[in-house]
């Protein structure tokens, strides 16, 4: 009886340990599925919009961004512009687009604000910075967590280097940014995320060092032209497979 009980306990300990080990992998996989579904739904929804819908939403976002330029240091003085949560919110859940970072292989929804609910599973747009539509006198700032056991998010943002690119997809626009500055600052140091006259920037923010989180990693990108998508060329041929045993002697011959 004691031997049987010991066996059961060992099996239970094994499965508990296995669950703990597999939790980050399974949870990250689950979150990636949710993120992909949100992006697919977003793309499906924007395909149903009319050109005048795009024009109206971009107009509202442009007006918001212009107001930001006229407010001195909104990140410090706490001034807010009415209607923020409704701008670019096409499906009522706060998603304004998504970010794609090829270097670290992430594609994440971008939501209004940086609440815990947003940052635990996606990227948040910091209110008081430009909405992500590009244009002169804009500086969009996006934030995501790093090192969560449940989601990868910006965990590998420190692997970005100058010259790397990332894109923001907002409605029917794809904005491409090339990394031109990487800095580590203290949380209260915000000079590097202000709007600069005539510039079009997007800065990605996460905590650093990994697991300590006393500072902030800032990865800034300057807007560049979005490359044309590569054309897929289909070649139709009547080619047939040759037995490798026939080819080998021919290749080996002097």
Model-derived segments and spans:
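Solvent-exposed, non-transmembrane regions of membrane-associated and secreted proteins
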Residues: 4-7, 13-253
């Amino acid at each position: 009886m004691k031997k049987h009980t010991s066996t059961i306990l060992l099996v239970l300990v094994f499965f508990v340990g296995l669950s703990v080990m597999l939790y980050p992998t399974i949870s990250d996989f689950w979150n990636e599925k949710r993120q992909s579904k949100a992006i697919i739904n977003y793309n499906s929804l924007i395909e149903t919009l009319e050109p005048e819908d795009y024009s109206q939403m971009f107009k509202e976002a442009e007006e918001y961004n212009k107001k930001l330029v006229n407010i001195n240091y909104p990140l410090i003085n706490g001034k807010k512009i009415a209607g923020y949560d409704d701008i670019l919110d096409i499906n009522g859940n706060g998603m304004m687009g998504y970010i794609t970072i090829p270097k670290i292989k992430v594609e994440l929804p971008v939501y209004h604000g940086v609440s815990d609910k947003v940052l635990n599973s996606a990227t948040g747009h910091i209110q008081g910075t430009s909405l992500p539509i590009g244009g002169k006198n804009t500086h969009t700032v996006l934030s995501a967590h790093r090192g969560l056991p449940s989601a990868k998010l910006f965990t590998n943002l420190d692997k970005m280097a100058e010259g790397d690119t990332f894109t923001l997809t907002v409605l029917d626009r794809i904005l491409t940014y090339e990394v031109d500055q990487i800095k580590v600052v203290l949380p209260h140091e915000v000079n590097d995320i202000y709007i600069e006259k005539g510039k079009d920037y997007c800065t990605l923010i996460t905590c650093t060092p990994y697991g300590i989180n006393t500072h902030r990693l800032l990865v800034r990108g300057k807007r560049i032209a979005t490359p044309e998508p590569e054309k897929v060329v289909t070649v139709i041929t009547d080619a047939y497979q040759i037995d490798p045993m026939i080819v080998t002697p021919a290749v080996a011959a002097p």
